[in-house]
Amino acid sequence: MLYPLLRPLLFKFDAETAHEHTLKMLDRAHRLHLTPLAASPAARQPVQAMGLTFPNPVGLAAGLDKNGAHIDALAALGFGFIEIGTVTPRPQDGNPKPRLFRLPEHEAIINRMGFNNHGVAALLDNVRRSKFKGVLGINIGKNAITPIENAVDDYLACLDQVYAAASYVTVNISSPNTKNLRQLQQGDELGRLLAALKQRQLALADQHGRYVPLAVKIAPDLDDEQIAEIARLLTGNGIDGVIATNTTLSRREVAGHPLESEAGGLSGAPVRARSTEVIRKLHKELGGAMPIIGVGGILSGNDAVEKLDAGASLVQLYSGLIYRGPELVGECARATAQYLQARN
């Protein structure tokens, strides 16, 4: 209710400063028990996926709360699950500023953040301080200084550390803002990475007496052959879920915009159709072998339903929150609940 009034003020700041201010305001509102003024109630529609029970299928995508410093305030908005990160083994600053740009005419964002985060130890401190008892995903990546041939070491180091704190762990191999990272989506390299992660996951499950599912986040910039190969490797290595999709390098939908040439990943409305197309093709290739979490360009309840209709079991929001505000969470939860009830 308040966000339409606040948005013009926030948009006077550069995008990254506005992001920081918004999170501080949410924290303050949560402490003062004022969150209901910012968000509408979310419908309860439990979904079973990856062996977990999600109160509703609408989650927060990774990237908004990289360090897990705002979990409680964000959870109070009505999300069915929260995903924090991307986190790397060691702290890193990310790419030079400016690195986050709004394209309001397209309801889009370009970012080249570069996995800026305080490191896995700091994230875990924040998780321990949180009171949140719901489904918490932790998204892991590699440090920029780690050679791509040693990337598996960073992913394993993160997995070791976050395992006990996470409801599920997401392996981010699709950010366009870490040099050569998307190479890890390719056949042999992806196969080796997934095999190593699966082996470690099973060892950690024995060690902790608890199985924590692994999901992999993929890019929208994949052809049909690549989608089929990724589906085969995910299934063959016993991965528990897949998140489709990350941001796109394509600028076709924003051609002619003054910021078109800014480097980084494009998100928001322009990626909606491509993300949904990847979900539909991935769903066909997987044949129900694992759940898909659909993300990309969700700015309305209808957009969320579109992802479920294409084959996703769950959805996630990020850029839509920047343009629509916290009310989007409840809108998507109500729309998806209505869709799932009608389907069942």
Swiss-Prot record:
<feature type="binding site">
    <location>
        <position position="86"/>
    </location>
    <ligand>
        <name>FMN</name>
    </ligand>
</feature>
<comment type="function">
    <text>Catalyzes the conversion of dihydroorotate to orotate with quinone as electron acceptor.</text>
</comment>
<feature type="binding site">
    <location>
        <begin position="318"/>
        <end position="319"/>
    </location>
    <ligand>
        <name>FMN</name>
    </ligand>
</feature>
<feature type="binding site">
    <location>
        <position position="268"/>
    </location>
    <ligand>
        <name>FMN</name>
    </ligand>
</feature>
<feature type="binding site">
    <location>
        <begin position="246"/>
        <end position="247"/>
    </location>
    <ligand>
        <name>substrate</name>
    </ligand>
</feature>
<dbReference type="GO" id="GO:0005737">
    <property type="term" value="C:cytoplasm"/>
</dbReference>
<keyword id="KW-0560">Oxidoreductase</keyword>
<comment type="similarity">
    <text>Belongs to the dihydroorotate dehydrogenase family. Type 2 subfamily.</text>
</comment>
<feature type="binding site">
    <location>
        <position position="172"/>
    </location>
    <ligand>
        <name>substrate</name>
    </ligand>
</feature>
<keyword id="KW-0665">Pyrimidine biosynthesis</keyword>
<feature type="binding site">
    <location>
        <begin position="111"/>
        <end position="115"/>
    </location>
    <ligand>
        <name>substrate</name>
    </ligand>
</feature>
<dbReference type="GO" id="GO:0044205">
    <property type="term" value="P:'de novo' UMP biosynthetic process"/>
</dbReference>
<feature type="binding site">
    <location>
        <position position="139"/>
    </location>
    <ligand>
        <name>FMN</name>
    </ligand>
</feature>
<dbReference type="Pfam" id="PF01180">
    <property type="entry name" value="DHO_dh"/>
</dbReference>
<keyword id="KW-0288">FMN</keyword>
<keyword id="KW-0472">Membrane</keyword>
<keyword id="KW-0285">Flavoprotein</keyword>
<dbReference type="InterPro" id="IPR013785">
    <property type="entry name" value="Aldolase_TIM"/>
</dbReference>
<feature type="binding site">
    <location>
        <position position="66"/>
    </location>
    <ligand>
        <name>substrate</name>
    </ligand>
</feature>
<protein>
    <recommendedName>
        <fullName>Dihydroorotate dehydrogenase (quinone)</fullName>
        <ecNumber>1.3.5.2</ecNumber>
    </recommendedName>
</protein>
<feature type="binding site">
    <location>
        <position position="297"/>
    </location>
    <ligand>
        <name>FMN</name>
    </ligand>
</feature>
<dbReference type="InterPro" id="IPR005720">
    <property type="entry name" value="Dihydroorotate_DH_cat"/>
</dbReference>
<keyword id="KW-1003">Cell membrane</keyword>
<dbReference type="GO" id="GO:0006207">
    <property type="term" value="P:'de novo' pyrimidine nucleobase biosynthetic process"/>
</dbReference>
<feature type="binding site">
    <location>
        <begin position="62"/>
        <end position="66"/>
    </location>
    <ligand>
        <name>FMN</name>
    </ligand>
</feature>
<dbReference type="InterPro" id="IPR005719">
    <property type="entry name" value="Dihydroorotate_DH_2"/>
</dbReference>
<feature type="binding site">
    <location>
        <position position="177"/>
    </location>
    <ligand>
        <name>substrate</name>
    </ligand>
</feature>
<comment type="pathway">
    <text>Pyrimidine metabolism; UMP biosynthesis via de novo pathway; orotate from (S)-dihydroorotate (quinone route): step 1/1.</text>
</comment>
<feature type="binding site">
    <location>
        <position position="245"/>
    </location>
    <ligand>
        <name>FMN</name>
    </ligand>
</feature>
<dbReference type="GO" id="GO:0106430">
    <property type="term" value="F:dihydroorotate dehydrogenase (quinone) activity"/>
</dbReference>
<comment type="subunit">
    <text>Monomer.</text>
</comment>
<dbReference type="InterPro" id="IPR012135">
    <property type="entry name" value="Dihydroorotate_DH_1_2"/>
</dbReference>
<dbReference type="InterPro" id="IPR050074">
    <property type="entry name" value="DHO_dehydrogenase"/>
</dbReference>
<feature type="binding site">
    <location>
        <position position="217"/>
    </location>
    <ligand>
        <name>FMN</name>
    </ligand>
</feature>
<feature type="active site" description="Nucleophile">
    <location>
        <position position="175"/>
    </location>
</feature>
<dbReference type="GO" id="GO:0005886">
    <property type="term" value="C:plasma membrane"/>
</dbReference>
<feature type="binding site">
    <location>
        <position position="172"/>
    </location>
    <ligand>
        <name>FMN</name>
    </ligand>
</feature>
<dbReference type="InterPro" id="IPR001295">
    <property type="entry name" value="Dihydroorotate_DH_CS"/>
</dbReference>
